[in-house]
């Protein structure tokens, strides 16, 4: 009861308004020593006896309140997690002691039918806690700053900078002696802060996306209404509705249900599922509903569940490196080693030339502090060359591009769960998609019905009268009983009193059809008792219910795929409601009706019944023969707007769309033709036929398969496995059911449906399509291609900078004995190249041209011949320009005077930076001449370019003391900008040069252009 005591003390204890009695007695004694007159004395002190009496009355009142609250809230109290332990420890004895599940329900003030009162939520959360797990605190911004400081090359540079400051102060005094070192320190600080800000913003973005992943909703009964709430709002006492594919959101006890099978492998590690019943009612959070449905009462939430304790111990390990990041890390390592060699050679050349000059002038035995400063600066330059050469911006660019794409896709209703999925989707060559809800709207209505050998089109106003005119009341009664008893949908009342049907789209359509007929509220239906329920799943393709009739007999109702149910029937209901034998001619007519419905793109479902003996085994499965056919439903599910254009886009992008559905083959073919998936050369096949093929037959068949109907989840898995294994395809697969999990896991990219998908399917997927729309899947592919191409653009840009910076400093060191680009200047270039360059180029949005080329195949080179052509061409131009300025600048520009060398070095630095600025613009298009297309709409790119130019002006004109530059006149500025802008002309010339034959040469940007393709995309 300690927790209740704390709760009552916190909320209902009445603190004394005046000081404590002991303090008042001390005050009385003090007053007594000063005020001798007793009458006057007691004006200054209270009557303690009366006060004690008043306090006694207050205590008495409080005790009464406590007793009342104990009595009132005793129904909500269990000592020391006792309620949670009953479920987590599977304590049957304790459960029995409390009166079973019914007793627990009463003790937590809940009702199986009405649930809890919403007004109790705060009280329940205060006592039992909230349904959230303890999460590790997010990393602060300063932790990212610390991480950025851990770069070894920056640490070495910092040491060099401090040495430079120390030696400079000793030789040149304050403040001139510290300029060089302080310039390096400020540059390091700037690099660290920009890196930290970038990483911190990305972490916030990924955390936001992670929070989106955790948004899970569940159906509960509260205040007598069934409603949908977030799992985080669950409290003890809630009545939760579970169905196939759900992840159990809290610990609870089974109330009632049908064939509930729970997968506890996530907690126990046991692969065998557990049957849950009233004899074994314990259901644990984190487990998954493998089959069946049920209602449970919540007994523990959040950190009081075993799942909560387990989740709180798991640290966020972050994302694994994506395949592209791994590949680029290899590239970065090679470039870094080359940079290290150049840095060592540059330092050795500078040192040797310095020693030779010193030996020839003052001798090697005389050393001054200025000599030490020179060597320190040489070493700093060498280390900075390593900083520039090591392209740590490559993995950063990938992460930045993926994060940007993920954010945009989130706005487009696609939640990317794994980073690698986004880039992999850009290489997808096949999309295996479901039909229902993905290609179609998933808003279903009964459009036609066949009953007693009569087909009728359904209209809400006339169908009741039309059916009454062609069938007897007994036939109609059987139809309605089959609809209302054999359904997983439910009619609920909203707050405004209106009725709403909850359930899957198919179940809703049939139940709404039944509600539109007369006789809905007949007492006969409510008098029936459900004995056994077999929920629908994608393997059986049917659902069944066994009911006990008021007459004492029992009856099975079965509903499902038309061909399967028809095979189970040997009788049919005639117009008078009698069961008559089903002749072969009638069976053929029924099949023709099914095919006719399917050819109109209608989903077909059959409803049948079977009378059974009263002594049937309740645990036996539903029979597979001897049924009597009642009706066939033709359900309309229109194709989504935009799907046909999306499929056309896929074709022009070299992506094959294959429909894999459990529907009738004629329905599937009709929808596939309407969407543009099924072509004249395409193959439509049924799952059983596909599964019977040999590997050799599959090898010939699979490339042409465009539609697979009546397929099982295993058939989808087999198709995906063979596409990846036999044809080395990058395959993406959509799925919504629990049984789709193996195919989603096997595919390169698993796409789960956010609306129709189960939690099991979502957990197995890489991307969750929040609106279940096929067009959204194409957007994922577009952004995947954009990520790949954007990284190629950045690599092209960065390698150009690397080559020029390394060569120009090395050649200058060899010939002149000095490096024109100082450590501070190289650090600024490094920031332009790594962080700002990645930000500018990695965030380019996709364009339509990307979807007019086939995808990159596995094993293709990341750096294409087109990229090498651009890199080498731009590098040669920049080396020529900078070399001309270095060796002939003074004479060519007629620069004379004591500061001529400083002006030339500043001009070299300024021209070098502007070459990178214009080459960054050049890199927006690797093959197209027009590099300005769409640049106005990309504000990030414009902002980066503007910031680079603005800061370059500040460095040259105002920070010369730190950056070793001098102010330039307007002619020199014009020259620098002009030399940089010529990079655009060089880019145009380079793009006119063919790059040779071969596979790569025919694949600009890594993609092979299609010979033909629609232009209106």
Curated annotation (Swiss-Prot):
GO molecular function: ATP binding; ATP hydrolysis activity; calmodulin binding; metal ion binding; P-type calcium transporter activity
Annotated signal sequence range: none
EC numbers on record: 7.2.2.10
UniProt KW keywords: ATP-binding, Calcium, Calcium transport, Calmodulin-binding, Ion transport, Magnesium, Membrane, Metal-binding, Nucleotide-binding, Phosphoprotein, Translocase, Transmembrane, Transmembrane helix, Transport
Subcellular location: Membrane
SMART domains membership: Cation_ATPase_N
Stretches that traverse the bilayer: 154-174, 177-197, 229-249, 331-351, 385-405, 803-823, 826-846, 875-895, 939-959, 973-993
Enzyme class: translocase
Membrane topology summary: Multi-pass membrane protein
GO CC terms of this entry: intracellular membrane-bounded organelle; plasma membrane
UniProt topological domain (Cytoplasmic) ranges: 1-153, 198-228, 352-384, 824-825, 896-938, 994-1017
Regulation: Activated by calmodulin.
Catalyzed reaction equations: Ca(2+)(in) + ATP + H2O = Ca(2+)(out) + ADP + phosphate + H(+)
Chief site of localization: membrane
Top-rank taxon: Eukaryota
Residues annotated for Mg(2+) binding in this entry: 736, 740
Active site: 434
Function as written in the Swiss-Prot or TrEMBL entry: This magnesium-dependent enzyme catalyzes the hydrolysis of ATP coupled with the translocation of calcium from the cytosol out of the cell, into the endoplasmic reticulum, or into organelles.
The record's note on its domains: The N-terminus contains an autoinhibitory calmodulin-binding domain, which binds calmodulin in a calcium-dependent fashion.
Protein name: Probable calcium-transporting ATPase 8, plasma membrane-type
Taxonomic lineage: Eukaryota, Viridiplantae, Streptophyta, Embryophyta, Tracheophyta
């Amino acid at each position: 009861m300690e927790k209740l005591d704390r709760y009552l003390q916190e909320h209902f204890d009445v603190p004394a308004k005046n000081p404590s009695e002991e303090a008042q007695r001390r005050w009385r004694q003090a007053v007594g020593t000063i005020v001798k007159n007793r009458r006057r004395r007691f004006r200054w002190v209270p009557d303690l006896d009366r006060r004690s009496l008043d306090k006694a009355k207050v205590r008495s009142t409080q005790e009464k309140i406590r007793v009342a609250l104990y009595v009132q809230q005793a129904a909500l109290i269990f000592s020391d997690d006792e309620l949670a332990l009953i479920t987590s420890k599977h304590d049957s004895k304790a459960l029995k002691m409390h009166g079973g599940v019914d007793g627990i329900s009463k003790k937590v003030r809940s009702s199986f039918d009405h649930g809890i009162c919403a007004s109790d939520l705060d009280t329940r959360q205060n006592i039992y806690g909230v349904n959230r797990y303890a999460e590790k605190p997010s990393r602060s911004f300063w932790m990212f700053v610390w991480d950025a400081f851990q770069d070894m090359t920056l640490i070495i540079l910092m040491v060099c900078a401090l040495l430079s400051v120390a030696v400079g102060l000793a030789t040149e005094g304050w403040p001139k002696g510290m300029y060089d070192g302080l310039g390096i320190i400020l540059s390091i600080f700037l690099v660290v802060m920009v890196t930290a800000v970038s990483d911190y913003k990305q972490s916030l973005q990924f955390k936001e996306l992670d929070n989106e992943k955790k948004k899970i909703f569940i159906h509960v009964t509260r205040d007598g209404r069934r409603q949908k709430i977030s799992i985080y709002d669950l409290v003890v006492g809630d009545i939760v509705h579970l169905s196939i594919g759900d992840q159990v959101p809290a610990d609870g006890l089974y109330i009632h249900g049908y064939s509930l099978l729970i997968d506890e492998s996530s907690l126990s590690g046991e692969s065998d599922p557990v049957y849950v019943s009233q004899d074994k009612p314990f259901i644990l959070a984190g487990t998954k509903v493998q089959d069946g449905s049920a209602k449970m009462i919540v007994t523990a939430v959040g950190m009081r569940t075993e799942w909560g304790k387990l989740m709180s111990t798991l640290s966020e390990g972050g994302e694994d490196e994506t395949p592209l990041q791994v590949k680029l890390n290899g590239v970065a390592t090679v470039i870094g080693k080359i940079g290290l060699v150049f840095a060592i050679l540059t330092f050795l050349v500078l040192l040797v030339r310095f020693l030779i000059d010193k030996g020839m002038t003052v001798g090697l035995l005389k050393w001054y502090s200025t000599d030490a400063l020179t060597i320190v600066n040489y070493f700093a330059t060498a280390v900075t060359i390593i900083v520039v050469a090591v392209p740590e911006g490559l993995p950063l660019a990938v992460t930045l591009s993926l994060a940007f794409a993920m954010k945009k896709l989130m706005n487009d209703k696609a939640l990317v769960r794994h980073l690698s999925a986004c880039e992999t989707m850009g290489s997808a060559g096949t999309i295996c998609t479901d039909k229902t809800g993905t290609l179609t709207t998933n808003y279903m209505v009964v459009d036609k019905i066949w009953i007693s050998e009569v087909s009728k089109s359904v209209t809400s106003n006339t169908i009741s009268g039309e059916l009454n005119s062609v069938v007897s009341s007994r036939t109609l009664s059987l139809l309605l009983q089959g609809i209302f008893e054999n359904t997983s949908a439910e009619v609920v009342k909203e707050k405004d009193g209106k009725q709403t049907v909850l359930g899957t789209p198919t179940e809703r359509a049939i139940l709404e059809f039944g509600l539109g007929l007369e006789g809905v509220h007949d007492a006969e239906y409510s008098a029936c008792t459900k004995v056994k329920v077999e929920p629908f799943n994608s393997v059986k393709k049917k659902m069944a219910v066994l009911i006990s009739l008021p007459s004492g007999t029992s009856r099975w109702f079965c509903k499902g795929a038309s061909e399967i149910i028809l095979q189970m029937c040997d009788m049919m209901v005639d117009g008078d409601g009698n069961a008559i034998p089903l002749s072969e001619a009638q069976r053929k007519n029924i099949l023709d009706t099914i095919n006719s419905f399917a050819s109109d793109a209608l989903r077909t479902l059959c409803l049948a019944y079977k009378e059974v003996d009263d002594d049937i085994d309740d645990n036996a499965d539903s029979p597979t023969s001897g049924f009597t056919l009642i009706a066939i439903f033709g359900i309309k599910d229109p194709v989504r707007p935009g799907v046909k254009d999306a499929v056309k886009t896929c074709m022009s992008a070299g992506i094959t769309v294959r429909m894999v559905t459990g529907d009738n083959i004629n329905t599937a073919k009709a929808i596939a033709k309407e969407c543009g998936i099924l072509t004249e050369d395409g193959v439509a096949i049924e799952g059983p036929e596909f599964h019977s093929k040999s590997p050799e037959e599959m090898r010939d068949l699979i490339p042409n398969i465009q539609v697979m109907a009546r397929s099982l989840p295993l058939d989808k898995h087999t198709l995906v496995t063979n596409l990846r294994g036999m044809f080395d395809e990058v395959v993406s697969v959509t799925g919504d059911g629990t049984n789709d999990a193996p195919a989603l896991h096997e595919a390169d990219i698993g796409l789960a449906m956010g609306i129709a998908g189960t939690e099991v399917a979502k957990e197995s997927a890489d991307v969750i399509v929040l609106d279940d729309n096929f067009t959204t899947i194409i957007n994922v592919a577009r952004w995947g291609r954009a990520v790949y191409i954007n990284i190629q653009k950045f690599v092209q840009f960065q390698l150009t900078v690397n080559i020029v910076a390394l060569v120009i400093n090395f050649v200058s060191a060899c010939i002149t004995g000095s490096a024109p680009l100082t450590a501070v200047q190289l650090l600024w270039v490094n920031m332009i190249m790594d962080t700002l360059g990645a930000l500018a180029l990695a965030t380019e949005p996709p364009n339509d041209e990307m979807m007019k080329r086939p995808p990159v195949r596995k094993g293709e080179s990341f750096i294409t011949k087109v990229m090498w052509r651009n890199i080498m061409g731009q590098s040669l131009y920049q080396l020529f320009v900078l070399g001309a300025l270095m060796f002939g600048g003074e004479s060519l520009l007629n620069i004379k005077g004591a500061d001529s060398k400083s002006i030339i070095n500043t001009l070299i630095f300024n021209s070098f930076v502007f070459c990178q600025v214009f080459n960054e613009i050049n890199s927006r298009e690797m093959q197209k001449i027009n590099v300005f297309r769409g640049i106005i709409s990309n504000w990030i790119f414009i902002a980066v370019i503007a910031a680079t130019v603005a800061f370059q002006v500040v460095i040259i004109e105002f920070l010369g003391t730190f950056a070793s530059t001098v102010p330039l006149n307007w002619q020199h500025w014009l020259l620098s900008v002009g030399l940089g802008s010529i990079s655009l002309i060089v880019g145009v010339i380079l793009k006119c040069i063919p790059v040779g034959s071969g596979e790569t040469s025919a694949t600009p940007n890594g993609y092979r252009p299609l010979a033909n393709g629609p232009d209106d995309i």
